[in-house]
Amino acid sequence: MAKRNPSIDTKNLTAVQLMELDACVRCGECVKWCPTYAASGEKPGLAPRDKILRWRQYMNKSYGLKARLFGPQEIPISELEEFKDDVHGCTTCGICSTVCEAGINTVELWESMRANLVKKGIGPYGKQNMFPKLIGQYRNPYMKDQKDRLAWVPPDVKIEDKADIVYFTGCTAGYNQLALAFATSRVLNKLGIKFAMLGEDEWCCGSALIRTGQAHINNVPYELAKHNVEAIQKKGAKKVLFACAGCFRAAKVDWPRLLGKELPFEVVHVSEFLAGLIKEGKIKWEKSINKTVTYHDPCHLGRHVGVFDAPRYVLSHIPGVKFVEMDRIKEFQRCCGAGGGVKAGLPDLAMAVAESRVKDALDTKADILSSCCPFCKRNLMDGRDSLKVDLVVEDVIELVAEALNLETK
């Protein structure tokens, strides 16, 4: 009788991750904090602990002592398909890793599980499977023409051909959420900051592919990172500014990992850059906002990279802003619901998480819910509209632009 092959393999799982599967002590702390588990009505399969225990069970069935003695046990494809749905029902926000008593790096574990299944033809989820083809062909996920990368730039914005600073716009801000690009570019001009942009040479950062377990398909993320780094170098940049938290995380964490070396320039989020200018007394405000503002930490900016204080510092120094905090902030913040491909693959789940976060903001009595991420802004606006409540959702850079008496349209 032919020996059965294991239903799963160890591809994409490092030795550390294999040990992490055994490190879970089933305490359930992650279950209490998981935003998608809560928003789903506590569907058991979405709990972080459940995903680890199930994958550990799969590994034992495939490679444990009994498997070595008597051959691997078959795992029905229907069961793996169900697991695929659950592992993709995660925004990769990282709160489970933050509260994990065993210190398991769950974000990278989920991404490895996703990649493992995708390589076996199981997953990704829904529209997520279009990402490699779209981004590989169009260099952006929206099927937009690369020639239109700078179509949004208004006549009043001055861009240098080469400069020490490059503003990396990002696909979402450059094609869909133009207010973010308008605000960032005009603020930089107003402050006398000379900057260049990549234009047609700006390609997608690759974040969506990596988060959904598709980094290996045609090696697209590597090609994106390599091209963007070379394009930035050609501009003579020493510093690259990002207003998109997802792009920032990709450049800060993923690009060096993909390329196997440190980047030849500094990667800075615009909130960090502005906080530095405020401390140096280089921003002269022209208008008072006179609103109560709260702040939502984007997962990619906060938990993933550790930028928590800069956006708060900026907001607290805008004239007329009364800054208030929500109940869950910084390392323990509640995700907006858009990350990890959930907005594209499971929009109803993304909406449910967003509604929970909007309710957090409403509890503060704030007039404005701010963030530093176009995906957070979009999903929080959707959550607000679903709840039919009166709450302005704006990016921090938009509030800065307003206080400098600049247009964001």
Curated annotation (Swiss-Prot):
The keyword Transmembrane does not apply. Signal peptide: none annotated. [4Fe-4S] cluster 1 binds at residues 24, 27, 30, 100. Keywords: 4Fe-4S, Iron, Iron-sulfur, Metal-binding, Methanogenesis, Oxidoreductase, Repeat. It catalyses: methanophenazine + coenzyme B + coenzyme M = dihydromethanophenazine + coenzyme M-coenzyme B heterodisulfide. Pathway: Cofactor metabolism; coenzyme M-coenzyme B heterodisulfide reduction; coenzyme B and coenzyme M from coenzyme M-coenzyme B heterodisulfide: step 1/1. [4Fe-4S] cluster 2 binds at residues 34, 90, 93, 96. It comes from the Archaea. Its EC number is 1.8.98.1. Its cofactor is [4Fe-4S] cluster. Binds 2 [4Fe-4S] cluster. One of its GO terms (biological process) is methanogenesis. It is an enzyme of class 1 (oxidoreductase). The dihydromethanophenazine:CoB--CoM heterodisulfide reductase is composed of two subunits; HdrD and HdrE. Part of a complex that catalyzes the reversible reduction of CoM-S-S-CoB to the thiol-coenzymes H-S-CoM (coenzyme M) and H-S-CoB (coenzyme B). Electrons probably transfer from phenazine to the high potential 4Fe cluster in HdrD subunit, then to the low potential heme in HdrE subunit and finally to CoM-S-S-CoB. This is Dihydromethanophenazine:CoB--CoM heterodisulfide reductase subunit D. It comes from Methanosarcina thermophila (strain ATCC 43570 / DSM 1825 / OCM 12 / VKM B-1830 / TM-1). The lineage of its organism: Archaea, Methanobacteriati, Methanobacteriota, Stenosarchaea group, Methanomicrobia.
